[in-house]
């Protein structure tokens, strides 16, 4: 996990948010349709017109995150991603203002650029021009509040998002939007585990997901690759055929006999049937080759 610095993209984010709000604005009633504090508002914002074009907001989020999942750092593909609201669309608490403040108190970015949708809905806009002056957007559609996450599936591309679903609508300290995340998130190359220091109760469930055996195996492998040769051309490694993958694993495990490598890692080479699914999955996590292992 790393700090997602959205600041260089703020102008583009606000331009897309303003465009959507202006399209929803009815000058006769001086109101928005659909209302900004409804699920239909986000549903409309997610339509192809706003989200999927080359200049759409999905591509913008991918640029901001360098095509990486905001949680596990897997390389993102448009066919296998989901959108994460840092401040959930539907705050499942009695006092939404208190819950909202828990996020903004911990992230200056959210405090400066996002407004609770129910508060925004009470604002009075006399004209379309008034919308152009907005600098805090309703949290359901504020791009400042949106991140991209992977689908969390290891064996096949499918809908849904494991990372996202692990969190649901529960409060989660917005570490990805906090510069100090680099010091707080620690990956252990020996066990493959990820931990947060100091511990944070809101992350317990998410860390259980991120410490799934497959995630840990992948981190262990990347730590071994990093230890073996930090000057490798990973793009060349990515294209290795099965025979070269086997030789590569023998090197990183320092074994002359492939059978001496623990069985759980064999699948990452493509054995026994030449299936490259797990090899490709491993390569999707090449961010860990650049991680400063401790």
Briefly describe each language-model feature range.
Residues 195-294:
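C-terminal, charged low-complexity interaction regions
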Residues 21, 41, 57-61, 96, ...:
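Generic structural signal of hydrophobic/aromatic residues within well-ordered alpha-helices
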Residues 74-148, 157:
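Histidine-centered nuclease catalytic patch
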Residues 137-139, 144-151, 155-221:
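Long, low-complexity, intrinsically disordered segments enriched in glycines and aromatic residues
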Residues 51-60, 133-140:
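Short, intrinsically disordered, charge-biased short linear motifs at domain edges
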Residues 54-81, 150-157:
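Short cysteine-rich loop/turn motifs with clustered Cys
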Residues 1-56, 75-77, 91, 292-294:
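A boundary/linker detector
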Residues 4-22, 165-182, 265-289, 293:
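C-terminal/domain-terminus segments
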């Amino acid at each position: 996990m790393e700090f997602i610095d959205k600041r260089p993209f703020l102008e583009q984010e606000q331009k897309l948010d303003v465009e959507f709000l202006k399209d929803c604005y009815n000058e006769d009633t001086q109101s928005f349709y659909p209302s900004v504090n409804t699920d239909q508002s986000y549903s409309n914002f997610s339509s192809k017109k706003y989200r999927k074009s080359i200049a759409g907001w999905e591509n913008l989020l991918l640029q901001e995150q360098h095509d990486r999942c905001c949680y596990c750092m897997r390389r993102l593909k448009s066919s296998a991603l989901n959108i994460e609201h840092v401040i959930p669309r539907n705050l499942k608490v009695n006092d939404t203002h208190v819950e909202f403040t828990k996020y903004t108190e911990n992230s200056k970015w959210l405090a400066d650029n996002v407004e609770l949708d129910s508060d925004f809905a009470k604002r009075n806009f006399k004209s379309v021009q008034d919308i152009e002056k907005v600098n805090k957007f309703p949290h359901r559609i504020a791009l400042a509040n949106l991140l991209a996450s992977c689908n969390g599936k290891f064996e096949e591309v499918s809908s849904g998002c494991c990372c996202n679903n692990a969190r649901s609508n529960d409060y989660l300290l917005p570490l990805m939007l906090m510069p100090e995340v680099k010091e707080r998130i620690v990956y252990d190359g020996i066990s493959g585990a990820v931990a947060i220091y100091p511990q944070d109760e809101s992350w317990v469930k998410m860390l259980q997901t991120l410490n799934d055996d497959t995630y840990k195996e992948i981190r262990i492998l990347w730590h071994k690759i990093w230890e073996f040769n930090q000057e490798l051309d990973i793009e060349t490694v990515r294209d290795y055929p099965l025979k070269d993958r086997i030789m590569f694993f023998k090197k990183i495990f320092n074994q002359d006999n492939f059978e001496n490598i623990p069985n759980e890692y064999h699948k990452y080479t493509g054995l026994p049937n030449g299936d490259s699914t797990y090899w490709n999955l491993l390569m999707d996590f090449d961010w860990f080759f650049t991680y400063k292992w401790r």
